[in-house]
Amino acid sequence: MIHCRSMDSPIGPLILAGHGSVLTNLQMVDQTYEPSRVGWLPENGAFAEAVSQLDAYFAGELTEFAIELDLCGTEFQQRVWQALLTIPYGETRSYGEIAEQVGAPGAARAVGLANSRNPIAIIVPCHRVIGASGQLIGYGGGLNRKLTLLELEKHQVLTSLTLFD
């Protein structure tokens, strides 16, 4: 049984869904690809930790999530999403770099398609994938949100650096 709840965030309302405390979906309410929500039931408090971690992320206090995920997709999508989880907070990779990482050189467009089907936005950080020349390309939640997330992470990385040790 899939349970869901919404939460407010600096990038707009988010929908969390899953079974037990295991997250299967984290979506922006108006993103371009949304899963069917038929049969989803209100959650019973099981996502309190996920909401707490997301709040801490948006406050700049959390750089790595510790939430159990259940990613459902094709074998290729799974490989791409696992690769996304290796991109450090505050850093970016190109679609081509991810294609190379998953053993599919030249499949940058396929990586983009897998990103567009990422069921767990933000936590599986598809927003950290950019074009080869550094430009922002494609994001199911819109380029403004992608830029906001990248700026949040970059700001936190820059403010945590010390000039002199």
UniProtKB/Swiss-Prot annotation:
<keyword id="KW-0808">Transferase</keyword>
<keyword id="KW-0234">DNA repair</keyword>
<keyword id="KW-0227">DNA damage</keyword>
<dbReference type="GO" id="GO:0006307">
    <property type="term" value="P:DNA alkylation repair"/>
</dbReference>
<comment type="function">
    <text>Involved in the cellular defense against the biological effects of O6-methylguanine (O6-MeG) and O4-methylthymine (O4-MeT) in DNA. Repairs the methylated nucleobase in DNA by stoichiometrically transferring the methyl group to a cysteine residue in the enzyme. This is a suicide reaction: the enzyme is irreversibly inactivated.</text>
</comment>
<dbReference type="Pfam" id="PF02870">
    <property type="entry name" value="Methyltransf_1N"/>
</dbReference>
<dbReference type="GO" id="GO:0032259">
    <property type="term" value="P:methylation"/>
</dbReference>
<dbReference type="InterPro" id="IPR014048">
    <property type="entry name" value="MethylDNA_cys_MeTrfase_DNA-bd"/>
</dbReference>
<protein>
    <recommendedName>
        <fullName>Methylated-DNA--protein-cysteine methyltransferase</fullName>
        <ecNumber>2.1.1.63</ecNumber>
    </recommendedName>
</protein>
<feature type="active site" description="Nucleophile; methyl group acceptor">
    <location>
        <position position="126"/>
    </location>
</feature>
<dbReference type="GO" id="GO:0003908">
    <property type="term" value="F:methylated-DNA-[protein]-cysteine S-methyltransferase activity"/>
</dbReference>
<dbReference type="InterPro" id="IPR023546">
    <property type="entry name" value="MGMT"/>
</dbReference>
<keyword id="KW-0489">Methyltransferase</keyword>
<dbReference type="InterPro" id="IPR008332">
    <property type="entry name" value="MethylG_MeTrfase_N"/>
</dbReference>
<dbReference type="Pfam" id="PF01035">
    <property type="entry name" value="DNA_binding_1"/>
</dbReference>
<dbReference type="InterPro" id="IPR036217">
    <property type="entry name" value="MethylDNA_cys_MeTrfase_DNAb"/>
</dbReference>
<dbReference type="GO" id="GO:0005737">
    <property type="term" value="C:cytoplasm"/>
</dbReference>
<keyword id="KW-0963">Cytoplasm</keyword>
<dbReference type="InterPro" id="IPR036388">
    <property type="entry name" value="WH-like_DNA-bd_sf"/>
</dbReference>
<comment type="similarity">
    <text>Belongs to the MGMT family.</text>
</comment>
<dbReference type="InterPro" id="IPR001497">
    <property type="entry name" value="MethylDNA_cys_MeTrfase_AS"/>
</dbReference>
<dbReference type="InterPro" id="IPR036631">
    <property type="entry name" value="MGMT_N_sf"/>
</dbReference>
